Regions:
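A short, structured beta-strand/loop element
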Residues: 28-39, 43
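Extended aliphatic helical segments
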Residues: 32-34, 52, 66
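Negatively charged, low-complexity tracts enriched in Asp/Glu with abundant Ser/Thr
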Residues: 1-25, 46-64, 71
Length: 74
């Protein structure tokens, strides 16, 4: 989880760490709960603004790629 926290800090993303869970606060658009599993991070959408969903949907794939590559480097 340290690499994920480092990534969040480097990208000016607010986060809340609680045990094995990290909640990423991505502006007013996304709030993502990240749970570290054995071989990957699992994400759960907590909040999603549908009005911007079409324009920013690729961000989900980007976040997922970053999280999983971060875990592989750990």
């Amino acid at each position: 989880m340290r690499n994920l926290i480092r990534w969040a800090k480097n990208n000016n993303i607010e986060y809340i760490k609680s045990g094995d869970k990290i909640t990423l606060l991505l502006g007013s658009i996304y709030t993502v709960e990240v749970i570290k599993g054995k071989n990957k991070y699992y994400m759960k959408k907590l909040k999603y603004n549908n009005e911007v969903a079409q324009a920013d949907f690729s961000l989900w794939g980007y976040i997922e790629d970053v999280l999983n590559s971060t875990l592989k480097r750990a």
